[in-house]
């Protein structure tokens, strides 16, 4: 499922809604293909991830340069310059369904996460459940995710990602792994997804079924980065002079940083992901903002103020 184009083709076979797309080859008339799909279009790396190898194109004039730029970035980042054209939705939400499967034929979905707050096509605030998903959408999207997993014969933890516009949704990609934002799902369903993933790898059956899952409250996660929002979120590496996670709000901190650590240019500049759970979305947002404000971090320029203002 690391190949996004192959994944789209499989999802079409499974009856999962997909956006129009076509692989860019040497024989393809790219300008004609984009006209057929309809602008705006997205040039997208098939082996991509993390927002790399992607270009939004509004008009024909910028298409060829965008294709070449995406191919170069894809080759440098993934060792594969395969790119494709896909219809771009100007107004949409990034909503994903957490799935779990075992080797005994059991499959469940753990409801949705909203991941629309992004910069440079990378998520920075995630929440569950999505404020835009009705019970009807949740049921249909969950069924589509299960259909996708069945088509793949999937076991272990994974994510089926969709674009949502109004009450319609389209397949985006499958992430065949546990994602950074999985804690928000754990918080609202009260299950340990890492534990289930390990149990499945050991040949055990899932410890719960679909009927035993329900949504309790609201969870939000923020990604605290060493970066400068005023300079287009440019990474800001350097020493961590002081790091003291807040002790209020019963927040969950996932981090490998401590006082004295060095944030380098060789790796992603994430300092921590911070997750809170509360009875309502409003309470969760306020609680997370307060947790971030009362976390002590010195020596680095961070996106903390941006996160607090966004919340």
Name what the model sees in each region.
Residues 1-160, 164-181:
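N-terminal beta-alpha lobe that positions the nucleotide/phosphoryl donor
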Residues 201, 290-311:
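A short N-terminal helical cap/helix-turn-helix that marks the beginning
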Residues 18-20, 157-158, 204-210, 231-235, ...:
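Acidic/polar loop patches that form or flank catalytic/metal-binding clefts of enzymes
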Residues 133-167, 175-230, 309:
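Active-site "cap" helix and flanking loop/linker of ATP-utilizing ligase/carboxylase catalytic domains
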Residues 211-267:
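Glycine-rich active-site loop/lid that clamps phosphate-bearing ligands
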Residues 283-286:
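Channel- or pocket-lining gating/hinge segments that regulate access to a cavity or pore
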């Amino acid at each position: 499922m690391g190949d996004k184009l192959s994944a789209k083709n499989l999802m079409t076979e499974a009856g999962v809604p997909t956006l129009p797309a076509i692989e860019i080859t040497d024989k393809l008339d790219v300008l004609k293909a984009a006209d057929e799909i309809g602008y705006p279009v997205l040039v997208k790396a098939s082996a991509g991830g993390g927002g790399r190898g992607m270009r939004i194109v509004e008009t024909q004039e910028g298409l060829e340069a965008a294709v070449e730029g995406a191919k170069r970035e894809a080759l440098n980042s993934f060792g594969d310059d395969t790119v494709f054209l896909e219809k771009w939705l100007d107004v949409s939400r990034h909503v994903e369904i957490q799935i779990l499967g075992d080797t005994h034929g059991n499959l469940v979905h753990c409801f949705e996460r909203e991941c629309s707050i992004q910069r440079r096509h990378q998520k920075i605030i995630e929440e569950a459940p999505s404020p835009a998903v009705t019970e009807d959408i949740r049921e249909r999207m969950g069924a589509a995710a299960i259909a996708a997993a069945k088509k793949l014969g999937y076991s272990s933890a994974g994510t089926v990602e969709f674009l949502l516009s109004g009450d319609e949704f389209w397949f985006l990609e499958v992430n065949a792994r546990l994602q950074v934002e999985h804690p928000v799902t754990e918080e609202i369903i009260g299950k340990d997804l890492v534990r289930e993933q390990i149990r499945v790898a050991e040949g055990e059956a899932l410890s719960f079924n679909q009927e035993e899952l329900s949504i309790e409250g609201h969870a939000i996660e923020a990604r605290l980065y060493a970066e400068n929002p005023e300079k287009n979120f440019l990474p800001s590496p350097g020493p961590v002079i002081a790091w003291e996670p807040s002790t209020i709000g019963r927040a969950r901190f996932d981090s490998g940083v401590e006082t004295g650590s060095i944030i380098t240019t060789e790796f992603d500049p994430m300092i921590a992901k911070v997750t809170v759970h509360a009875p309502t979305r409003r309470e969760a947002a306020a609680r997370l903002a307060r947790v971030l404000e009362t976390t002590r971090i010195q020596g680095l320029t961070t996106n903390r103020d941006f996160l607090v203002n966004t919340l």
